[in-house]
Structures are given as structure tokens and as C-alpha cells.
Amino acid sequence: MVVDKIQAIRGMNDVLPDSTSIWRFIEQTFINCLVRYGYKEIRFPIVENTQLFKRTIGEITDIVEKEMYTFNDLNGDSITLRPEGTAGCVRACIEHGLLHNQQQKLWYLGPMFRHERPQKGRYRQFNQFGVEALGITGTGIELELISICRRLWIDLGFSQSVQLQVNSLGEINERQKYRSILVEYLRDHFQILDEDSKRRLDKNPLRVLDSKNPDLQQLIQNAPKLIDVLGDDSREHFQSFCNGLETLGIPYSINPVLVRGLDYYGQTVFEWVTDQLGSQATICAGGRYDMLVEFLGGAPTPAVGFALGLERIFLLMETLNLLNESNNKQSIFIIATNEEAILKALVMAESIRNAHPSLDVITNTAGGGFKSQFKKADKSGARLALILGEDEIAKEYVSIKDLRTEIEQISIPMTKINEFLQDYLA
């Protein structure tokens, strides 16, 4: 009987064992960095009430109109797979009283879902790392988030391959004033607009500036600039932010047409971009969203955050040949030829793990000949092969082969293995 194979849904990819160690390295680098800055993890469901995203992201956005995975559950309630993390994080903070006279510095990591056209760097299920700081005013917290990003890029090895772009969206009344100016400009060029931009023109014209249509980029670049209509307070806030970047020694450029694809942003917005990934140039984006908590029924609360996609980080590191460097943890492969040797190998492996917690120890419990086991050892990427054959078991010795050099194989007493590893791998 021929049975059709069931495959993964288009745009939702498996991460296979050859790549998971690199993913884990990237994830752990993020986690370690945020812990060092005093941020705490929060977890929230991947499924939320659909109204959460319609209210926060904005109904006239590509995400809500075209990209959300929305369906009715068995009770007839409309629910949605989360397309981004900020709304769910804020909802959880309000629901559990985390913002009552408190400041919160939070991070999260997990899958998001958007029904986009799959392409390199853009998938229907993607993994996002997010950071949110709530209850803190001023530019200091914005600068801290930028510093966190820069630290992440340094730790991952590509700080010279990304550039920071910044802009200010001002206060809501300033955006409304700018909206009228922008609409007038766009109406003068109505015949050039694509259908999406024409539809956005009356309901959410700032989204036109977020268009990725190459035919509209010249029109967008020539559009009136929001920064030119900012009031004194917004100008002072943005100037303070830029001055802080200069004090911290963080290079940046002002991108006057930078807007965020989500409606809840205001004041400072930023993106980290690279010229290494073609059209998928943005690897991290964020900004201030002081009105979002109030939109969701909470008390007015200042807030700022950013998010980045792990798939694009992986692609960037792959493009820059950084993946091998990220996966260089020392490891040992123990070769055992029979049942007695396998038992000895298990005992030895536990002893090594106790004495050297940072070492990965791989034990081959499947047995087999030396040739096949050495192939497995090479494929594992291990630095050393520890060999327990019949001769070694009889003499209570272990043979050691460095798999990355031409150093001659040696044998030492089993009781000396931890002492040897301490010196050899130092």
C-alpha cells in the first residue's frame, strides 16, 4: 500500500540536529546577555483572543488584514496564533498586576506566526526574541536597550556588519498633524500608488511609508518628513536620545521615513539593518509605545522594547561564516568495542562530567568496529576520542587520540583521565 507522506506546512520549517546546537548557542547568548542586564523571563500563550491584536497592532496593517492565523475554537470564539510578542506580554502584565506601581524589565523567546509569502529570512512560523521595559520614562531606558542590542552583536561576532537607524514618531497630536500633510502629498501622486497604499491612504497613511514596494521608494524618500513637524518636547526627547548614543559611542543614522509596522509606537523608533541579507535587511526593530498599556485597559504606563528574529540572525551568521565559531565547545567521544567496555565507558563518562562540567561527553553505546566508531567520532565534531578496546580494558588503560591534530595516540591509566584532561584542554 502506498501512503502519501505528510510534510511540514509551507513556510514552517524543521530545525534538524546539525543546526540545533547553533540555535541553542544563539538563544543562550541572548539569555545570558539579558540576565547580565537584570532582565527577567516571562512566558505567555502562543494563542490569544483575536481582539488583542486588532486593538494593538492596528486593523489597517498587513499583519491584521492579511497575515494572521485566525480561526474559531469549539466555543465559537475568534482566536489567533500570535504574530508578535509585545501585545501578549503587555496583556499578561496587566492581567496579573505586574504594573501596579512597579517597573518591569522582561524578555521572552518563542515562535510567532504570520501568513506571509515564504522566502529566505521570512517564514510563516518564525522564532522571535523580545525585550520589553515597562514603567520607565526618559531616554535612559531607550539607550539601555540599544546598548543591549550592541552587546548581543558583539557577543555573536557581527557588530561591524549591522547599522543602527533611528527616527522619532512624536506625540499622537503631532502624528495627526503630519498625517494631513502626508495625505495631501500622496494624493498629488495618487496615480503612482499601488492598491495597498491607496487603501491605506485615508485610514492609515503612515503605513504607506512602510511599503516595501520598490516602485514606491523614490516617492517615499521625497515625502514630507514627520520630524519637521515635531513640537519642542518631542524634539528635545529625540535630541537627548541621539546625544546619548554619541556619548555611548554607538554610531547611528537618522532615517526620516522609518516608521514601525505596528500602530502602537510613538516617539523613539529604531532598527538595526545589514547589507548582507539582500531585501531582508532588518534584523532587529523596536521603539517606545507609551499608549499601549492604556489601549489594553491598564493605567497609562511608559514602555519601550525591541524584537529580533532568530532565523535572520542565523542567516546573517551563516553569511559571515560565523556558525563554526559559535559551535566550538570542547567535546569528547568515547569509543567502546564490547559490552564490558561500554559499561566502563559509561562509568568514565560520568566521572568526566563530574570533574569537567563544561565538557560535552558522547558515549557510543552501540558498539561496532573501530573504523565505524572513529567515523562517528569525527562526525560528532569531538576534539578527543577516548578508546576502550579489549587491550585497554585488560590493562585498565584508556587510549587517547586527538582528532584535530597529528599528535600521536597515547595511553594512560584510567584513573588519570581527569588529570590528563585538565592539563590537555586547558
Swiss-Prot record:
Compartmental location: Cytoplasm
Pfam families found in the cross-reference section: HGTP_anticodon, tRNA-synt_His
Single annotated GO MF: histidine-tRNA ligase activity
Enzyme class, broadest EC rank: ligase
Natural source organism: Legionella pneumophila subsp. pneumophila (strain Philadelphia 1 / ATCC 33152 / DSM 7513)
The name this protein goes by in its record: Histidine--tRNA ligase
CDD domains from the UniProt entry: HisRS-like_core, HisRS_anticodon
Record note on quaternary structure: Homodimer.
